[in-house]
């Protein structure tokens, strides 16, 4: 059979054409539109666990986010549960460490940030070079990215960090992220195969900085050693130990 792929920028247009029967499959619809499609009863809306994640890049390679206490302040100020409930209508779960739940190597005891304004302000007090503002890059590639950007802007505003939102064409955003020309940016990630390598090595190895995966430009020699050790054995228990140690 002949397969035709259409590029339709507006999610509302994708949803309308799907409802009318003009499309057989539509991708990247907001959760509220999925709920409306369910109620219409014309389209099958399937729900299943996913290893797809959405995360923010905090640029470790340049000021001011090369300061760990500033990154901690942002992490404590983020309203994770508010995003899950308000933006995703509960159809998601906050990550606990880089390896998603459901994949071997997941650490149920890994440290997890939560929204805590007091801890965010305490971390910010330790920052020597406090930023006048930070820029948040996003595109219309995912309809959830803009509300996540707005939520982040509001949350950080409460602790005195001004966030400027910059919406770009997705290709332009990727180019900026690849060059490290940003403060905060957003992205989605789905593994090519179900192995922690796709999250740990891609995201954190020093030699994968930029678009290859380490888009936060993180660098840590001890972490590099543990990640490389995890690739030198086929023993899953040993690999799990290395990956979990790298997260500490």
Language-model features: locations:
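Extracytoplasmic/peripheral linker and loop segments enriched in polar/acidic and small residues
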Residues: 158, 162-173, 201-248
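Short, hydrophobic alpha-helical packing/hinge segments within bilobed ligand-binding/sensory domains
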Residues: 14-15, 23, 34, 70, ...
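Beta->alpha turn/N-cap motifs
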Residues: 11, 27-33, 51, 80, ...
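Well-structured core secondary-structure elements of compact alpha/beta domains
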Residues: 2, 7, 49-63, 138-140, ...
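Append "and occasionally in soluble cytosolic enzymes with long acidic Gly/Pro-rich linkers
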Residues: 66-154, 219, 225-226, 245
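Ligand-binding "clamshell"
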Residues: 35-47, 179-182, 195-212
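Ligand-site clamp/hinge motif
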Residues: 1-36, 153, 162-164
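Ligand/substrate-recognition segments at binding pockets and active sites
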Residues: 125-191, 236
